[in-house]
Amino acid sequence: MAKRRGLALDGVLLLDKPVGLSSNHALQRAKRTVDAAKAGHTGTLDPFATGLLVCCMGRATKISGRMLEADKTYQAMLQFGEETDSGDLTGHIVARAPDGFAGVEEAALRDVLSRFVGTIEQIPPMYSALKRDGKPLYEYARAGIELDRPPRQVTIRHIELLSFSGMQAQIDVACSKGTYIRTLAQDIGRALGCHAHLAALRRTHVGPFSLDRAVTLEALQAMPDAKQALLAMNELPAGLLPAT
Protein backbone atom coordinates (compact mmCIF):
# COMPACT_ATOMS: atom_id res chain seq x y z
CA MET A 1 0.00 0.00 0.00
CA ALA A 2 1.36 3.43 -0.93
CA LYS A 3 2.17 5.72 1.98
CA ARG A 4 -0.38 8.49 2.47
CA ARG A 5 1.29 11.80 1.62
CA GLY A 6 -1.26 14.57 2.12
CA LEU A 7 -1.31 18.05 0.64
CA ALA A 8 1.54 20.53 0.39
CA LEU A 9 -0.02 22.95 2.87
CA ASP A 10 1.91 25.90 4.33
CA GLY A 11 0.74 27.64 7.49
CA VAL A 12 0.37 27.50 11.26
CA LEU A 13 -2.43 25.83 13.20
CA LEU A 14 -2.93 27.04 16.76
CA LEU A 15 -4.29 23.96 18.52
CA ASP A 16 -5.83 23.77 21.99
CA LYS A 17 -4.43 20.41 23.07
CA PRO A 18 -6.82 18.33 25.18
CA VAL A 19 -5.88 16.56 28.38
CA GLY A 20 -4.72 12.95 27.98
CA LEU A 21 -3.04 13.23 24.57
CA SER A 22 0.68 13.52 23.99
CA SER A 23 1.75 16.51 21.92
CA ASN A 24 2.74 14.25 19.05
CA HIS A 25 -0.59 12.41 19.04
CA ALA A 26 -2.44 15.73 19.02
CA LEU A 27 -0.23 16.95 16.17
CA GLN A 28 -0.82 13.80 14.11
CA ARG A 29 -4.60 14.08 14.54
CA ALA A 30 -4.51 17.70 13.43
CA LYS A 31 -2.22 16.84 10.51
CA ARG A 32 -4.63 14.15 9.30
CA THR A 33 -7.63 16.44 9.74
CA VAL A 34 -6.18 19.21 7.55
CA ASP A 35 -4.58 16.59 5.25
CA ALA A 36 -1.09 18.10 5.45
CA ALA A 37 1.96 16.30 4.07
CA LYS A 38 4.42 17.81 6.54
CA ALA A 39 3.89 19.02 10.10
CA GLY A 40 5.73 19.63 13.35
CA HIS A 41 5.08 21.32 16.69
CA THR A 42 7.16 23.88 18.52
CA GLY A 43 7.32 22.61 22.09
CA THR A 44 5.99 19.63 24.00
CA LEU A 45 3.12 19.73 26.47
CA ASP A 46 2.83 16.84 28.94
CA PRO A 47 -0.20 14.57 28.36
CA PHE A 48 -1.92 15.85 31.53
CA ALA A 49 -1.51 19.47 30.37
CA THR A 50 -3.77 21.39 28.00
CA GLY A 51 -3.52 24.51 25.93
CA LEU A 52 -1.57 26.05 23.11
CA LEU A 53 0.29 23.74 20.76
CA VAL A 54 1.72 25.60 17.77
CA CYS A 55 1.52 23.21 14.80
CA CYS A 56 3.56 24.21 11.76
CA MET A 57 2.65 22.86 8.33
CA GLY A 58 4.91 22.73 5.28
CA ARG A 59 7.17 25.77 4.88
CA ALA A 60 5.99 27.10 8.24
CA THR A 61 8.13 24.43 9.93
CA LYS A 62 11.00 26.89 9.35
CA ILE A 63 9.78 28.87 12.37
CA SER A 64 10.00 25.85 14.70
CA GLY A 65 13.51 26.68 15.90
CA ARG A 66 12.55 30.23 16.85
CA MET A 67 9.44 29.06 18.63
CA LEU A 68 11.40 26.50 20.65
CA GLU A 69 13.55 29.40 21.86
CA ALA A 70 10.56 31.64 22.60
CA ASP A 71 9.12 32.54 26.00
CA LYS A 72 6.00 30.68 27.10
CA THR A 73 3.14 31.55 29.45
CA TYR A 74 1.19 29.06 31.56
CA GLN A 75 -1.67 28.96 34.03
CA ALA A 76 -0.84 26.42 36.72
CA MET A 77 -2.90 25.05 39.59
CA LEU A 78 -0.74 24.26 42.61
CA GLN A 79 -1.94 21.63 45.08
CA PHE A 80 -0.35 22.10 48.50
CA GLY A 81 0.39 19.38 51.02
CA GLU A 82 1.83 16.64 48.80
CA GLU A 83 4.83 16.25 46.50
CA THR A 84 4.86 13.58 43.79
CA ASP A 85 7.71 11.87 41.97
CA SER A 86 6.57 13.33 38.63
CA GLY A 87 5.75 16.79 40.03
CA ASP A 88 2.12 16.53 38.92
CA LEU A 89 -1.11 14.75 39.77
CA THR A 90 -0.19 11.67 37.72
CA GLY A 91 2.71 10.70 39.98
CA HIS A 92 3.13 8.82 43.24
CA ILE A 93 3.20 10.78 46.49
CA VAL A 94 6.75 10.95 47.87
CA ALA A 95 6.39 13.62 50.59
CA ARG A 96 3.60 15.16 52.64
CA ALA A 97 3.12 18.29 54.71
CA PRO A 98 3.65 18.01 58.47
CA ASP A 99 0.76 16.69 60.55
CA GLY A 100 -1.83 19.35 61.19
CA PHE A 101 -1.22 21.23 57.94
CA ALA A 102 -4.40 23.16 57.17
CA GLY A 103 -3.34 25.24 54.20
CA VAL A 104 -1.03 28.04 53.16
CA GLU A 105 -1.28 31.65 54.29
CA GLU A 106 -1.75 34.00 51.34
CA ALA A 107 0.89 36.45 52.56
CA ALA A 108 3.45 33.65 52.87
CA LEU A 109 2.61 32.40 49.39
CA ARG A 110 2.96 35.85 47.83
CA ASP A 111 6.33 36.28 49.52
CA VAL A 112 7.59 32.93 48.22
CA LEU A 113 6.29 33.55 44.70
CA SER A 114 8.21 36.84 44.55
CA ARG A 115 11.46 34.98 45.28
CA PHE A 116 11.13 32.94 42.10
CA VAL A 117 10.85 35.91 39.73
CA GLY A 118 14.04 36.56 37.76
CA THR A 119 16.86 34.22 36.79
CA ILE A 120 16.75 31.09 38.94
CA GLU A 121 18.29 27.63 38.93
CA GLN A 122 16.17 24.53 38.41
CA ILE A 123 17.13 20.89 38.68
CA PRO A 124 15.35 19.19 35.74
CA PRO A 125 12.89 16.49 36.82
CA MET A 126 13.64 12.82 36.32
CA TYR A 127 10.34 12.56 34.46
CA SER A 128 11.57 14.55 31.47
CA ALA A 129 12.78 13.91 27.91
CA LEU A 130 16.31 15.12 28.66
CA LYS A 131 18.77 12.39 27.78
CA ARG A 132 21.63 10.68 29.59
CA ASP A 133 23.79 8.30 27.53
CA GLY A 134 21.22 8.48 24.74
CA LYS A 135 18.34 7.44 26.99
CA PRO A 136 15.53 9.76 28.19
CA LEU A 137 15.56 10.47 31.91
CA TYR A 138 11.95 9.28 32.23
CA GLU A 139 13.06 5.76 31.30
CA TYR A 140 15.48 5.72 34.23
CA ALA A 141 12.74 7.13 36.47
CA ARG A 142 10.29 4.40 35.44
CA ALA A 143 12.95 1.84 36.37
CA GLY A 144 13.29 3.41 39.82
CA ILE A 145 16.71 4.93 39.08
CA GLU A 146 17.45 8.49 40.18
CA LEU A 147 20.41 10.24 38.53
CA ASP A 148 22.21 13.41 39.52
CA ARG A 149 21.13 16.29 37.28
CA PRO A 150 23.06 19.55 37.13
CA PRO A 151 20.94 22.66 37.76
CA ARG A 152 20.09 24.86 34.79
CA GLN A 153 19.42 28.56 34.68
CA VAL A 154 15.97 29.68 33.55
CA THR A 155 14.20 33.02 33.74
CA ILE A 156 10.78 33.62 35.27
CA ARG A 157 9.45 36.87 33.76
CA HIS A 158 6.50 37.15 36.11
CA ILE A 159 4.28 35.15 38.46
CA GLU A 160 0.78 36.42 39.17
CA LEU A 161 -1.50 34.87 41.78
CA LEU A 162 -4.88 34.43 40.07
CA SER A 163 -6.82 32.59 42.77
CA PHE A 164 -6.16 31.10 46.20
CA SER A 165 -7.99 28.82 48.63
CA GLY A 166 -5.39 27.74 51.20
CA MET A 167 -4.91 24.25 49.78
CA GLN A 168 -4.70 25.35 46.14
CA ALA A 169 -3.48 28.35 44.19
CA GLN A 170 -3.74 29.23 40.52
CA ILE A 171 -0.82 31.20 39.13
CA ASP A 172 0.05 32.76 35.78
CA VAL A 173 3.71 32.23 34.86
CA ALA A 174 5.67 33.76 31.97
CA CYS A 175 9.03 32.07 31.55
CA SER A 176 11.99 31.37 29.29
CA LYS A 177 12.55 28.21 27.29
CA GLY A 178 13.54 25.15 29.29
CA THR A 179 11.49 26.08 32.36
CA TYR A 180 9.75 23.15 34.04
CA ILE A 181 6.54 24.32 35.69
CA ARG A 182 6.34 20.98 37.54
CA THR A 183 9.71 21.75 39.12
CA LEU A 184 8.62 25.31 39.90
CA ALA A 185 5.56 23.97 41.73
CA GLN A 186 7.72 21.52 43.67
CA ASP A 187 10.23 24.22 44.62
CA ILE A 188 7.46 26.60 45.72
CA GLY A 189 6.02 23.88 47.95
CA ARG A 190 9.40 23.18 49.50
CA ALA A 191 10.01 26.89 50.12
CA LEU A 192 6.65 27.04 51.91
CA GLY A 193 7.56 23.98 53.96
CA CYS A 194 4.44 22.06 52.97
CA HIS A 195 5.27 20.43 49.60
CA ALA A 196 3.24 20.88 46.41
CA HIS A 197 2.56 19.46 42.97
CA LEU A 198 0.75 20.54 39.81
CA ALA A 199 -2.95 19.74 39.79
CA ALA A 200 -3.44 21.26 36.33
CA LEU A 201 -1.41 23.08 33.68
CA ARG A 202 -2.58 25.12 30.69
CA ARG A 203 -0.29 26.88 28.22
CA THR A 204 -1.67 30.21 27.04
CA HIS A 205 1.14 31.76 24.97
CA VAL A 206 4.11 30.65 22.86
CA GLY A 207 6.10 33.64 21.67
CA PRO A 208 3.67 35.89 19.75
CA PHE A 209 0.94 33.24 19.54
CA SER A 210 -2.00 33.15 21.96
CA LEU A 211 -4.47 30.49 23.04
CA ASP A 212 -7.24 33.01 22.27
CA ARG A 213 -6.94 32.11 18.58
CA ALA A 214 -6.57 28.36 19.08
CA VAL A 215 -9.04 25.71 17.95
CA THR A 216 -9.85 22.41 19.65
CA LEU A 217 -9.49 19.09 17.84
CA GLU A 218 -13.26 18.60 18.03
CA ALA A 219 -13.94 21.99 16.45
CA LEU A 220 -11.29 21.37 13.80
CA GLN A 221 -12.77 18.00 12.87
CA ALA A 222 -16.26 19.54 12.65
CA MET A 223 -15.21 22.19 10.13
CA PRO A 224 -16.38 21.72 6.51
CA ASP A 225 -12.86 22.71 5.42
CA ALA A 226 -10.37 22.36 8.29
CA LYS A 227 -7.62 23.98 6.22
CA GLN A 228 -9.36 27.31 6.83
CA ALA A 229 -8.16 27.15 10.44
CA LEU A 230 -4.53 27.62 9.37
CA LEU A 231 -2.77 30.97 9.61
CA ALA A 232 -1.34 31.61 6.15
CA MET A 233 2.33 32.44 5.72
CA ASN A 234 1.54 36.12 5.13
CA GLU A 235 -0.44 36.22 8.39
CA LEU A 236 2.52 35.19 10.56
CA PRO A 237 4.08 37.86 12.80
CA ALA A 238 6.93 39.75 11.17
CA GLY A 239 10.41 38.38 11.74
CA LEU A 240 9.45 34.78 12.46
CA LEU A 241 10.53 33.32 9.13
CA PRO A 242 14.28 33.15 8.50
CA ALA A 243 15.65 35.46 5.82
CA THR A 244 16.01 33.82 2.42
From Swiss-Prot:
Which protein is depicted? tRNA pseudouridine synthase B
User: What are the EC numbers?
Assistant: 5.4.99.25
Q: Identify its protein family.
A: Belongs to the pseudouridine synthase TruB family. Type 1 subfamily.
Species: Bordetella parapertussis (strain 12822 / ATCC BAA-587 / NCTC 13253)
Q: Which HAMAP family match?
A: TruB_bact (MF_01080)
Report the protein's function: Responsible for synthesis of pseudouridine from uracil-55 in the psi GC loop of transfer RNAs.
Catalytic site: 46
Q: Name one GO biological process term.
A: tRNA pseudouridine synthesis
* Gene this protein is translated from: truB
